[in-house]
Amino acid sequence: MLLLGLSALAVQVQADSDFASVRARYQSSEGRLYDRHGELLHELRVNLKQRRMEWTRLDDISPAFLSAVIRAEDQRFYDHAGIDWRALLASLGSEGTRGASTLSMQLAAHIDPTLKPAGRRRGWSEKWGQMQAARTLEKNWSKNEILEAYLNLVTFRGELQGVTAASRGLFDKQPSGLDQTESLVLAVLIRSPNASPLRVSERACVLGAGLRFPVDCPSLTARTEQALRTAVRLRPHAADAPHLARRLLKGKQTSVTSTLDARLQRYARAVLVHQLDTIGAQRVSEGALLVVDNASGEVLAWVGGGGVSHVDAVRAPRQAGSTLKPFLYQLAIEKRLLTAASVLDDSPLSLASTTGLYVPHNYERDFKGLVSVRTSLGSSLNIPAVRTATVVGADAFAARLRELGFQHVNRDGDYYGFALALGSAEVSLEQLVNAFRTLANRGQYSPIVPTRAVSVQNRRVLDEGASFVITDILADRSARSLTFGLENALATPFWSAVKTGTSKDMRDNWCVGFSERYTVGVWVGNFDGSPMQDVSGVTGAAPVWLELMRFLHTRTPSRPPRTPASVLETEVQFTPAFESARRELFLRGTETAEVRMPTTPPLAQARIRYPGRGSILAIDPDIPIEMQRVFFDVAPRDAHLRLDLDGRPLGNLDAGWTPAAGTHQLTLHDANGTLMDEVGFEVRGAYH
């Protein structure tokens, strides 16, 4: 007896917890992600050992269920002080002690696990401990508090713990909506959680008769069979941000308030899904988008995919395509190697590399001739970008990208070569969006943040003046018209700056841009890296970008940035006039009134500009041969020059040549038949 007394004293101390403490320690198995206004965005299971929902108040539980539980488990609950002496005396002659356990005693065992025997039935020693603990609870708690806590902690069936988990898991409804039949089934499960559906329904019918519920037992049996035989599927209350929820809801973080805006998040996801449906026939299955506030870096929308995949495409590395060009030109202007009016030659180019000749092409497989930096970037021409990379240096460009947060650019410039200018490196949408946000913030960099719990510091990465010039180019419709036209999915009715990109073989498609207040980035493609069919940045990602920008600026204006002191605007003209005279932006000290180019070279200097000597051209097996063309180029373009391929005149160079596998000889002659230049090249592929 002395040992029992000491045991009871220890139990009493352990069970001496108030209602508020027990409720505060309670943790749902479901993590909840809230938006910036406190609206539930996503519910995600984070505890795989048990299934608990949110704590449920007694007022939110069906009265029928409360009556059924008290009748089944503790008929004199409101009359005793923790111990039902009548039930206890009645159980003395039986083998078990289960029938004498009051709700208070059962609750004590839930609060203090030491009162539950492991792997065996409770004996009188555990019963005695529970009795003492129950008396302590009754002294400090109200009856309603005891009942409420009990119904949130008791196990019903399998992993379902608490009335809300059981109600939603078995009947797909909140406990406030339980009818009499459902209440009887759940009440019986407390004592017999693993019983067969038939046994549960039999006991529920008996319980219903005792409560004088008008129960149809055959119907109850059918309902029980359906509920207990069906796999438990607890549908989340909200499922609008699965990828960010999986990132933020970890460990003990079961409730996180994010910076997302629920209305924008849901709209953004719907827009992306609609676009994926629209272009799905073109071998496009997935997409992602990110919306960020420029000033704070707070994430307003994070959609990691259009489907149910766990892959978060906001963070997944993919080839960048042309989206890195703004940062290449920004570096060249910052170092005063180029200006927005500098002239670049968009003509055939062959560069020696560690793997052989590097021969870049424009997206449209043609050449524009002499173009300014403004036109080159605005119209996303590839060859001028590669020429710029040769001036800037691959090492310097790779280092700048790392400064901007492109963590996957982790090798020196030689590894990437000049192809880095065309996006051969892998980047994530998250990194791209923040890099463009850095441009929007005039070169000030800080991480983007999905919660307000993170404190960030700004640091200057880009020169303010050069960033302003690049921003102005990306906002210039005329600059992009050479490739995209004046009216396209990049044109907004308010001020914005934007860049598209398409990676090799159309595997990735990007559109990233910003307004005065927001930066929006969109990616479309396939998680398995398979190529899309005839999908460009303008037709794939850009429509989503445009729709989101319009939504964001329904009532919010977007004004162009003010010119910094380090930049001036002046009139510039081009001689010869390959581009019209215009007002142009310069870093102070680099301005010029005229850009003069040498006159056309004499015929004596005529040469074949493309292909280069020893070039190897490859036929694409995925494109019908009749759709493929090789465009030869000579300088100067003169009617007195004749280009022959394998001894036969080619005629109109602008029509292109359908490639044929094998070695070929290209020769250039003047009007008298004199040989001016010759080039040998090879075509490799399956077609002959």
Language model features with spans:
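Membrane-proximal periplasmic segments of bacterial cell-envelope enzymes
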Residues: L9-S91, E95-G96, T164, G177-Q253
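Soluble, non-transmembrane domains of envelope/secretory-pathway proteins that act on or interact
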Residues: V13-A15, A20-S21, Y34, P214-A238, ...
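A short, well-structured edge-of-sheet supersecondary motif
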Residues: E30-L44, I61, A281-G307, A399-L404
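Active-site SXXK
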Residues: S67-I70, D74, A268, S296-G297, ...
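Conserved catalytic neighborhood of penicillin-recognizing serine enzymes
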Residues: G93-A118, R233-H237, H243, R247, ...
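Non-catalytic, structured segments within soluble enzyme domains
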Residues: A100-R266, A399-D414, F418-G423, R437
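Active-site loop and adjoining helix of the penicillin-binding protein/serine DD-peptidase-beta-lactamase fold
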Residues: A134, E138, I190-G208, K252-L264, ...
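A penicillin-recognizing enzyme superfamily signal
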Residues: S258-A281, V291, W302-A313, L324, ...
